[in-house]
Design a protein with these regions (language model features):
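A general structural signal for well-ordered alpha-helical segments in protein cores
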Residues: 36, 66, 107, 111, ...
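Conserved beta-strand scaffold positions in the cores of enzyme catalytic domains, especially
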Residues: 53-55, 80-82, 165, 225-227, ...
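Short, intrinsically disordered, charge-balanced linker/junction segments flanking boundaries
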Residues: 6-7, 299-306
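Acidic/glycine-enriched edge-of-secondary-structure segments
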Residues: 24-28, 175, 304-306
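ATP-dependent carboxylate-amine ligase catalytic core
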Residues: 8, 29, 33, 40-41, ...
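N-terminal leader/targeting and accessory segments in enzymes
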Residues: 4-79, 89, 119, 201-203, ...
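Acidic, Mg2+-coordinating active-site environments of NTP-dependent enzymes
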Residues: 138-146, 153, 162-291, 295-302
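Buried hydrophobic packing segments
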Residues: 36, 69, 73, 128-135, ...
Length: 306
């Protein structure tokens, strides 16, 4: 098993090196939707085949919120693809196809397909196209898509009519991706929520009062349904945490989640799952099984190297 894991790791590293050293692909970060839209056009618009897309964007909590929503969907005997970044151990972790990960051979085949378009892309754009062309071939109920650093010109912002767009906590984490004269929290907020769809359901996660006020100003003209985090709360009773809204109270029975931020992300996902008509009893049974690998995770075995 150890030998197999080393082989997979070697294959993953090899694929990353192939992308990094590719003459057509660029290692730098360059936000622009023109390139990826041209590739998608040349590939006959596979993004239009993705039904029920849910975008996850923001600064902190995209993966944990997405993973929780995916866990609830799958516990409800439904299926979902998922695109996440970054991967923790293997490149294929980025591409979930509703029951399995994309394998290394399929990733290589997808790269060859993209090469034929002869359009220069950034590596993140390549990874996004790999996800889209493979997700388009899957018959699933939902497609869960995690954005990169920002959203305005992020390569995941290519779906015309997403089912929902989930905004997690926004902070100064991505200031370094902004122009020199625009490195402000206000600009981060604008880049993330100022370009959301007018034809979807927007969910806003827990924010500081300042960020929340700025988000509301940015969304003032947005025509979408908007659900803010004041519609639910995380409460503690008798040493137990609960999700609570006007209709439901759900016990957060978990030994795997070790921070208030992650608990709030879980609650945000519970709200979304309830709106997707997933029953309370299914959510309650699923919560103890949810783990966030590499996120405030206690390691009880294996060697830790200094």
């Amino acid at each position: 098993r150890l030998k197999l894991n080393k082989t997979r790791m070697s294959q993953s590293i090899s694929l990353y090196k192939q992308l990094a050293n590719h003459k057509l692909f660029n290692k730098t970060i360059n936000f622009d939707l023109t390139r990826i839209k041209l590739v998608l056009k040349k590939l006959s618009h596979p993004e239009r085949k993705l039904n029920n897309v849910i975008n996850f964007l923001g600064s902190s909590g995209k993966f944990t919120t997405l993973h929780s929503v995916k866990s609830f969907i799958e516990a409800n005997n439904q299926t979902a693809t998922a695109y996440i970044s970054p991967s923790l151990k293997d490149i294929k972790e980025r591409f979930w196809l509703g029951g399995r990960y994309l394998n290394h051979t399929e990733i290589k085949q997808s790269i060859k397909l993209i090469e034929k378009t002869k359009v220069p892309l950034t590596i993140f754009e390549v990874l996004t196209v790999i996800y889209i062309v493979n997700a388009a071939q899957q018959k699933v109920d939902y497609h869960l898509v995690e954005a990169g650093a920002l959203f305005a010109k992020d390569s995941t912002n290519v779906f015309d009519f997403p089912l929902a767009q989930v905004v997690v906590n926004i902070n100064k984490q991505h200031l370094n991706f902004l122009d020199k004269n625009k490195k402000t929290l206000d600009e981060v907020i604008y880049q993330k929520v100022g370009f959301l769809s007018n034809f979807t359901h927007i969910y806003i996660g827990k924010q500081t009062p300042y960020v929340l006020n700025k988000i509301k100003k940015n969304l003032r003209q947005n025509k979408s349904i908007i659900t803010y985090a004041n519609t639910w709360k995380l409460i503690k009773k008798n040493n137990h945490y609960f999700y609570q809204d006007k209709k439901f109270q759900i016990k957060i029975n978990t030994k795997n989640i070790h921070s208030m931020g992650l608990l709030n992300n879980l609650c945000h996902a519970i709200k979304i799952a309830l709106d997707l008509k997933i029953e309370k009893k299914i959510i309650e049974k699923t919560i103890p099984k949810i783990t966030f690998e590499g996120r405030f995770q206690y390691l009880n075995k294996g060697k830790i190297k200094n």
